[in-house]
Amino acid sequence: MSALDRALTIEDLKRIARRRVPRQFFDYIDSGAYTEQTYNANEADFKKITFRQRVAVNLENRNLGSTLLGQPVSLPIAIAPVGSTGMTDADGEIKAARAAEKFGIPFTLSTMGICSIEDVAENTTKPFWFQLYVMKDRDFIYRLIDRAKAARCSALVLTMDLQILGQRHKDLRNGLSAPPKFTPRFVAEMAMKPGWAMRMLGTNRRTFRNIAGHVSDAVNLASLTEWTRTQFDLTLNWQDIAWIKKRFDGPVIVKGILDKDDAQLAIDNGADAIVVSNHGGRQLDGAPSSIRVLPEIVDAVGHKTEVLMDGGIRSGQDLLKALALGAKGALVGRIMAFGLGAGGEAGVARALEIVRKETDTSMALMGERDIRNIGLHNIYSNDLDRRQGY
Protein backbone atom coordinates (compact mmCIF):
# COMPACT_ATOMS: atom_id res chain seq x y z
CA MET A 1 0.00 0.00 0.00
CA SER A 2 1.38 3.40 -1.01
CA ALA A 3 1.68 6.43 1.26
CA LEU A 4 -1.26 8.00 -0.59
CA ASP A 5 -3.41 4.94 0.02
CA ARG A 6 -2.56 5.04 3.71
CA ALA A 7 -3.53 8.71 4.00
CA LEU A 8 -6.86 8.98 5.78
CA THR A 9 -7.05 12.74 6.37
CA ILE A 10 -5.92 15.95 4.70
CA GLU A 11 -3.46 16.32 7.59
CA ASP A 12 -1.87 13.02 6.49
CA LEU A 13 -1.44 14.41 2.97
CA LYS A 14 -0.02 17.62 4.39
CA ARG A 15 2.70 15.66 6.20
CA ILE A 16 3.62 13.83 3.00
CA ALA A 17 3.68 17.09 1.04
CA ARG A 18 5.98 18.68 3.60
CA ARG A 19 8.53 15.92 2.93
CA ARG A 20 8.26 16.18 -0.86
CA VAL A 21 7.98 19.91 -1.59
CA PRO A 22 10.80 22.49 -1.15
CA ARG A 23 10.30 24.62 1.93
CA GLN A 24 9.61 27.93 0.19
CA PHE A 25 6.78 26.41 -1.85
CA PHE A 26 5.35 24.38 1.02
CA ASP A 27 5.39 27.46 3.26
CA TYR A 28 3.60 29.39 0.50
CA ILE A 29 0.60 27.05 0.75
CA ASP A 30 0.80 26.64 4.53
CA SER A 31 1.05 30.19 5.83
CA GLY A 32 -0.80 33.45 6.26
CA ALA A 33 -0.06 37.14 6.55
CA TYR A 34 1.77 38.85 9.42
CA THR A 35 1.10 36.96 12.72
CA GLU A 36 -1.21 34.43 11.01
CA GLN A 37 -4.06 35.27 13.39
CA THR A 38 -6.66 35.11 10.64
CA TYR A 39 -5.05 32.11 8.97
CA ASN A 40 -5.28 30.14 12.22
CA ALA A 41 -8.79 31.41 13.02
CA ASN A 42 -10.06 30.09 9.69
CA GLU A 43 -9.48 26.54 10.91
CA ALA A 44 -10.05 27.04 14.63
CA ASP A 45 -13.50 28.60 14.28
CA PHE A 46 -14.88 25.51 12.53
CA LYS A 47 -14.16 23.56 15.71
CA LYS A 48 -16.58 25.79 17.64
CA ILE A 49 -19.52 24.39 15.69
CA THR A 50 -21.04 21.06 16.74
CA PHE A 51 -23.42 18.75 14.89
CA ARG A 52 -26.77 17.43 16.00
CA GLN A 53 -26.66 13.64 15.86
CA ARG A 54 -29.89 11.96 14.73
CA VAL A 55 -30.48 8.20 14.79
CA ALA A 56 -32.95 5.57 13.57
CA VAL A 57 -33.22 7.30 10.18
CA ASN A 58 -33.31 5.46 6.84
CA LEU A 59 -29.86 6.16 5.36
CA GLU A 60 -30.22 4.31 2.07
CA ASN A 61 -29.63 6.02 -1.28
CA ARG A 62 -27.65 8.97 0.04
CA ASN A 63 -26.90 11.87 -2.31
CA LEU A 64 -23.86 14.18 -2.23
CA GLY A 65 -24.54 15.85 -5.56
CA SER A 66 -25.66 19.45 -5.91
CA THR A 67 -25.30 22.40 -8.28
CA LEU A 68 -22.99 25.42 -8.41
CA LEU A 69 -24.05 28.27 -10.70
CA GLY A 70 -26.64 25.94 -12.18
CA GLN A 71 -24.12 23.25 -13.13
CA PRO A 72 -24.25 19.77 -11.56
CA VAL A 73 -21.37 18.83 -9.24
CA SER A 74 -20.60 15.53 -7.50
CA LEU A 75 -19.99 17.43 -4.24
CA PRO A 76 -20.70 21.13 -3.56
CA ILE A 77 -17.08 22.23 -3.75
CA ALA A 78 -14.80 23.77 -6.36
CA ILE A 79 -11.02 23.95 -6.46
CA ALA A 80 -10.04 27.46 -5.35
CA PRO A 81 -7.51 29.53 -7.31
CA VAL A 82 -4.03 29.07 -5.86
CA GLY A 83 -1.10 31.02 -7.31
CA SER A 84 2.09 29.18 -8.25
CA THR A 85 0.38 25.78 -8.04
CA GLY A 86 2.83 24.57 -10.67
CA MET A 87 5.65 25.06 -8.17
CA THR A 88 4.07 22.65 -5.68
CA ASP A 89 4.44 19.97 -8.33
CA ALA A 90 5.42 20.19 -11.99
CA ASP A 91 2.48 21.17 -14.22
CA GLY A 92 0.44 21.39 -11.05
CA GLU A 93 -2.50 23.34 -12.44
CA ILE A 94 -2.97 20.77 -15.21
CA LYS A 95 -2.82 17.89 -12.74
CA ALA A 96 -5.29 19.53 -10.36
CA ALA A 97 -7.67 20.41 -13.20
CA ARG A 98 -7.64 16.83 -14.46
CA ALA A 99 -8.36 15.48 -10.99
CA ALA A 100 -11.22 17.95 -10.51
CA GLU A 101 -12.69 17.07 -13.89
CA LYS A 102 -12.66 13.35 -13.12
CA PHE A 103 -14.20 14.02 -9.71
CA GLY A 104 -16.96 16.16 -11.21
CA ILE A 105 -16.28 19.59 -9.71
CA PRO A 106 -15.02 22.92 -11.12
CA PHE A 107 -11.34 23.83 -11.15
CA THR A 108 -10.32 27.50 -10.87
CA LEU A 109 -7.10 28.65 -12.53
CA SER A 110 -5.33 31.62 -10.95
CA THR A 111 -4.09 34.59 -12.95
CA MET A 112 -0.81 33.87 -11.14
CA GLY A 113 -0.77 30.23 -12.16
CA ILE A 114 2.35 28.64 -13.56
CA CYS A 115 0.36 26.88 -16.29
CA SER A 116 -1.52 29.19 -18.65
CA ILE A 117 -5.19 29.28 -19.57
CA GLU A 118 -4.31 27.54 -22.82
CA ASP A 119 -2.19 24.90 -21.05
CA VAL A 120 -5.13 23.86 -18.89
CA ALA A 121 -7.65 24.02 -21.75
CA GLU A 122 -5.48 21.79 -23.94
CA ASN A 123 -5.21 19.17 -21.22
CA THR A 124 -8.84 19.01 -20.07
CA THR A 125 -12.15 18.37 -21.80
CA LYS A 126 -14.62 20.35 -19.68
CA PRO A 127 -14.90 24.10 -19.00
CA PHE A 128 -13.13 25.43 -15.93
CA TRP A 129 -13.28 28.70 -13.99
CA PHE A 130 -10.69 31.45 -14.33
CA GLN A 131 -9.72 33.80 -11.49
CA LEU A 132 -8.97 37.39 -12.47
CA TYR A 133 -6.96 40.08 -10.72
CA VAL A 134 -7.68 43.60 -11.95
CA MET A 135 -4.41 45.27 -12.93
CA LYS A 136 -3.51 48.74 -14.14
CA ASP A 137 -2.65 47.50 -17.62
CA ARG A 138 -6.17 47.28 -19.00
CA ASP A 139 -4.99 45.85 -22.30
CA PHE A 140 -3.58 42.90 -20.37
CA ILE A 141 -6.89 42.41 -18.55
CA TYR A 142 -8.85 42.61 -21.81
CA ARG A 143 -6.61 39.95 -23.30
CA LEU A 144 -6.89 37.70 -20.25
CA ILE A 145 -10.69 37.89 -20.32
CA ASP A 146 -10.72 37.18 -24.06
CA ARG A 147 -8.37 34.23 -23.59
CA ALA A 148 -10.59 32.83 -20.84
CA LYS A 149 -13.61 33.20 -23.09
CA ALA A 150 -11.82 31.54 -26.00
CA ALA A 151 -10.87 28.65 -23.73
CA ARG A 152 -14.57 28.19 -22.85
CA CYS A 153 -14.12 29.06 -19.19
CA SER A 154 -17.58 28.76 -17.67
CA ALA A 155 -17.17 31.45 -15.00
CA LEU A 156 -14.87 34.31 -14.07
CA VAL A 157 -13.84 34.58 -10.41
CA LEU A 158 -13.08 38.25 -9.76
CA THR A 159 -10.84 38.67 -6.72
CA MET A 160 -11.49 42.01 -4.99
CA ASP A 161 -9.24 41.76 -1.91
CA LEU A 162 -5.82 42.13 -3.48
CA GLN A 163 -5.34 45.76 -4.44
CA ILE A 164 -2.18 45.63 -2.36
CA LEU A 165 -0.22 42.56 -1.32
CA GLY A 166 -0.51 41.45 2.30
CA GLN A 167 2.63 41.20 4.41
CA ARG A 168 3.53 37.52 4.20
CA HIS A 169 6.55 37.00 6.41
CA LYS A 170 7.33 33.40 5.49
CA ASP A 171 7.37 34.19 1.78
CA LEU A 172 9.62 37.19 2.37
CA ARG A 173 12.05 35.24 4.54
CA ASN A 174 12.16 32.35 2.09
CA GLY A 175 12.76 34.60 -0.92
CA LEU A 176 9.82 33.00 -2.73
CA SER A 177 10.09 33.11 -6.53
CA ALA A 178 8.98 31.12 -9.55
CA PRO A 179 11.17 29.61 -10.82
CA PRO A 180 13.20 29.40 -7.61
CA LYS A 181 16.53 31.15 -7.24
CA PHE A 182 19.35 28.63 -7.09
CA THR A 183 20.87 29.75 -3.83
CA PRO A 184 23.19 27.38 -1.93
CA ARG A 185 20.36 26.71 0.51
CA PHE A 186 17.94 25.80 -2.28
CA VAL A 187 20.46 23.57 -4.07
CA ALA A 188 21.12 21.72 -0.81
CA GLU A 189 17.40 21.21 -0.35
CA MET A 190 17.09 19.81 -3.88
CA ALA A 191 19.51 17.06 -2.94
CA MET A 192 16.94 15.94 -0.36
CA LYS A 193 13.95 16.28 -2.73
CA PRO A 194 15.21 14.75 -6.00
CA GLY A 195 11.73 13.68 -7.15
CA TRP A 196 10.44 17.25 -7.16
CA ALA A 197 13.58 18.45 -8.95
CA MET A 198 13.38 15.78 -11.65
CA ARG A 199 9.73 16.50 -12.34
CA MET A 200 10.50 20.21 -12.66
CA LEU A 201 13.32 19.50 -15.08
CA GLY A 202 10.83 17.56 -17.17
CA THR A 203 8.61 20.57 -17.90
CA ASN A 204 9.13 24.01 -19.42
CA ARG A 205 6.30 25.47 -17.34
CA ARG A 206 8.24 27.19 -14.58
CA THR A 207 7.09 30.82 -14.62
CA PHE A 208 3.81 32.79 -14.73
CA ARG A 209 2.70 31.77 -18.21
CA ASN A 210 -0.52 33.82 -18.22
CA ILE A 211 1.66 36.93 -17.96
CA ALA A 212 4.98 36.09 -19.62
CA GLY A 213 3.85 36.53 -23.22
CA HIS A 214 2.30 39.93 -22.56
CA VAL A 215 5.23 41.70 -20.90
CA SER A 216 7.59 42.15 -23.83
CA ASP A 217 10.28 44.00 -21.86
CA ALA A 218 10.40 41.40 -19.07
CA VAL A 219 13.65 39.76 -20.07
CA ASN A 220 14.00 37.70 -16.91
CA LEU A 221 12.10 36.57 -13.84
CA ALA A 222 13.06 39.61 -11.80
CA SER A 223 11.58 42.04 -14.32
CA LEU A 224 8.42 39.94 -14.70
CA THR A 225 7.95 39.82 -10.93
CA GLU A 226 8.51 43.57 -10.63
CA TRP A 227 5.95 44.25 -13.36
CA THR A 228 3.39 42.12 -11.54
CA ARG A 229 4.10 43.75 -8.18
CA THR A 230 3.41 47.22 -9.54
CA GLN A 231 0.30 46.25 -11.51
CA PHE A 232 -2.30 45.57 -8.82
CA ASP A 233 -4.87 48.35 -9.24
CA LEU A 234 -5.31 50.62 -6.23
CA THR A 235 -8.33 52.23 -7.91
CA LEU A 236 -10.36 49.02 -8.20
CA ASN A 237 -14.04 49.77 -7.51
CA TRP A 238 -17.44 48.13 -7.68
CA GLN A 239 -18.22 49.64 -11.07
CA ASP A 240 -15.42 47.54 -12.57
CA ILE A 241 -17.63 44.48 -12.28
CA ALA A 242 -19.91 45.75 -15.07
CA TRP A 243 -17.32 46.13 -17.83
CA ILE A 244 -15.58 42.90 -16.85
CA LYS A 245 -18.87 41.02 -16.99
CA LYS A 246 -19.82 42.61 -20.31
CA ARG A 247 -16.52 41.66 -21.91
CA PHE A 248 -16.57 38.11 -20.55
CA ASP A 249 -20.26 37.64 -21.36
CA GLY A 250 -20.68 34.98 -18.71
CA PRO A 251 -21.12 34.47 -14.97
CA VAL A 252 -18.89 36.55 -12.68
CA ILE A 253 -18.24 35.36 -9.13
CA VAL A 254 -16.95 38.08 -6.81
CA LYS A 255 -14.43 36.75 -4.28
CA GLY A 256 -13.08 38.43 -1.17
CA ILE A 257 -16.29 39.39 0.63
CA LEU A 258 -16.20 39.64 4.44
CA ASP A 259 -18.84 42.31 5.04
CA LYS A 260 -22.58 42.19 4.38
CA ASP A 261 -22.55 45.70 2.91
CA ASP A 262 -19.86 44.67 0.43
CA ALA A 263 -21.92 41.60 -0.41
CA GLN A 264 -24.86 43.84 -1.30
CA LEU A 265 -22.64 46.14 -3.36
CA ALA A 266 -21.31 43.17 -5.30
CA ILE A 267 -24.83 42.05 -6.15
CA ASP A 268 -25.97 45.58 -6.99
CA ASN A 269 -23.13 45.82 -9.50
CA GLY A 270 -23.82 42.56 -11.28
CA ALA A 271 -22.15 39.71 -9.38
CA ASP A 272 -23.75 36.36 -10.18
CA ALA A 273 -22.38 34.80 -6.98
CA ILE A 274 -20.07 35.80 -4.16
CA VAL A 275 -17.35 34.05 -2.19
CA VAL A 276 -17.05 34.86 1.50
CA SER A 277 -13.27 34.87 1.80
CA ASN A 278 -10.29 36.46 3.52
CA HIS A 279 -7.84 35.17 0.91
CA GLY A 280 -6.95 32.21 3.08
CA GLY A 281 -5.68 34.51 5.80
CA ARG A 282 -3.01 35.88 3.45
CA GLN A 283 -4.20 39.48 3.19
CA LEU A 284 -5.59 41.42 6.18
CA ASP A 285 -4.32 39.68 9.29
CA GLY A 286 -6.73 40.32 12.15
CA ALA A 287 -9.79 40.05 9.91
CA PRO A 288 -12.44 37.56 11.04
CA SER A 289 -12.53 34.00 9.82
CA SER A 290 -14.72 33.32 6.80
CA ILE A 291 -16.97 30.93 8.71
CA ARG A 292 -17.56 33.53 11.43
CA VAL A 293 -19.02 36.14 9.08
CA LEU A 294 -20.76 33.67 6.76
CA PRO A 295 -24.11 33.61 8.67
CA GLU A 296 -24.71 37.37 8.60
CA ILE A 297 -23.81 37.57 4.92
CA VAL A 298 -26.16 34.69 4.12
CA ASP A 299 -28.89 36.45 6.10
CA ALA A 300 -28.31 39.65 4.13
CA VAL A 301 -28.03 38.36 0.56
CA GLY A 302 -28.48 34.59 0.52
CA HIS A 303 -31.98 34.95 -0.91
CA LYS A 304 -30.61 37.02 -3.81
CA THR A 305 -27.53 35.11 -4.95
CA GLU A 306 -25.42 32.01 -4.41
CA VAL A 307 -23.12 32.47 -1.44
CA LEU A 308 -19.96 30.37 -1.53
CA MET A 309 -17.14 30.45 1.00
CA ASP A 310 -13.51 29.51 1.38
CA GLY A 311 -10.93 29.56 4.16
CA GLY A 312 -10.17 26.90 6.75
CA ILE A 313 -11.92 23.91 5.21
CA ARG A 314 -9.80 20.80 5.82
CA SER A 315 -12.43 18.07 5.95
CA GLY A 316 -15.84 16.94 4.87
CA GLN A 317 -17.12 17.91 8.30
CA ASP A 318 -15.97 21.48 7.72
CA LEU A 319 -17.84 21.48 4.42
CA LEU A 320 -21.02 20.32 6.15
CA LYS A 321 -20.69 23.08 8.75
CA ALA A 322 -20.37 25.69 6.00
CA LEU A 323 -23.46 24.31 4.28
CA ALA A 324 -25.36 24.28 7.57
CA LEU A 325 -24.63 27.99 7.95
CA GLY A 326 -26.10 28.71 4.54
CA ALA A 327 -23.26 28.41 2.02
CA LYS A 328 -24.30 26.95 -1.32
CA GLY A 329 -20.84 25.42 -1.63
CA ALA A 330 -17.19 25.94 -0.81
CA LEU A 331 -13.92 26.59 -2.60
CA VAL A 332 -11.00 24.49 -1.38
CA GLY A 333 -7.41 25.50 -2.10
CA ARG A 334 -5.13 23.97 0.50
CA ILE A 335 -6.92 20.62 0.32
CA MET A 336 -5.93 20.54 -3.35
CA ALA A 337 -2.43 21.88 -2.72
CA PHE A 338 -1.58 19.38 0.02
CA GLY A 339 -2.83 16.55 -2.18
CA LEU A 340 -0.84 17.83 -5.14
CA GLY A 341 2.31 18.12 -3.07
CA ALA A 342 1.79 14.64 -1.67
CA GLY A 343 1.33 12.89 -4.99
CA GLY A 344 0.57 15.00 -8.05
CA GLU A 345 -2.72 14.29 -9.83
CA ALA A 346 -3.22 11.09 -7.83
CA GLY A 347 -2.69 13.07 -4.64
CA VAL A 348 -5.38 15.59 -5.57
CA ALA A 349 -7.73 12.73 -6.40
CA ARG A 350 -6.96 11.17 -3.02
CA ALA A 351 -7.62 14.47 -1.23
CA LEU A 352 -10.99 14.85 -2.92
CA GLU A 353 -11.93 11.26 -2.14
CA ILE A 354 -11.02 11.79 1.53
CA VAL A 355 -13.35 14.80 1.66
CA ARG A 356 -16.10 12.87 -0.11
CA LYS A 357 -15.87 9.98 2.35
CA GLU A 358 -15.82 12.29 5.38
CA THR A 359 -18.82 14.19 4.05
CA ASP A 360 -20.85 11.06 3.34
CA THR A 361 -20.12 9.41 6.69
CA SER A 362 -20.75 12.52 8.79
CA MET A 363 -23.89 13.42 6.87
CA ALA A 364 -25.29 9.95 7.50
CA LEU A 365 -24.46 10.11 11.21
CA MET A 366 -26.32 13.42 11.34
CA GLY A 367 -29.37 11.58 10.05
CA GLU A 368 -29.38 13.16 6.58
CA ARG A 369 -29.55 11.43 3.20
CA ASP A 370 -29.28 14.42 0.86
CA ILE A 371 -26.61 17.09 1.11
CA ARG A 372 -29.01 19.64 -0.33
CA ASN A 373 -31.07 19.39 2.87
CA ILE A 374 -28.23 20.39 5.20
CA GLY A 375 -29.13 23.50 7.21
CA LEU A 376 -29.25 25.16 10.60
CA HIS A 377 -31.27 22.25 11.98
CA ASN A 378 -28.12 20.11 11.74
CA ILE A 379 -26.06 22.13 14.23
CA TYR A 380 -26.60 23.35 17.77
CA SER A 381 -27.98 26.88 17.80
CA ASN A 382 -26.08 27.87 20.94
CA ASP A 383 -22.82 27.51 19.00
CA LEU A 384 -23.47 30.76 17.16
CA ASP A 385 -25.65 33.77 16.70
CA ARG A 386 -26.67 34.24 13.06
CA ARG A 387 -26.74 38.01 13.47
CA GLN A 388 -23.40 38.60 15.18
CA GLY A 389 -21.21 35.58 14.45
CA TYR A 390 -20.38 33.33 17.36
Predicted features and spans:
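A gly/proline- and charged-residue-enriched helix-loop-helix capping module
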Residues: K102-N123, P127-I141
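Short beta-strand segments
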Residues: A80-P81, Q131-Y133, V157-D161
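An N-cap/entry alpha-helix motif that binds or orients negatively charged groups
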Residues: M1-Q71, P179-L236, R372-I374, Y380-Y390
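Short beta->alpha linker loops
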Residues: A33-Y34, T111-C115, K136, L258, ...
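Alpha/beta catalytic cores of nucleotide-metabolism and tRNA/nucleoside-modifying enzymes
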Residues: M1-T50, R292-D310, R314-Y390
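Glycine- and other small-residue-rich loops at beta-strand/loop junctions that grip anionic moieties
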Residues: S31, T85, D89, L109-S110, ...
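Alpha/beta enzyme core
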Residues: R98, N123, D139-M309, Q317-K321, ...
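Glycine-rich active-site/cofactor-binding loop and its immediate structural neighborhood
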Residues: V73-M112
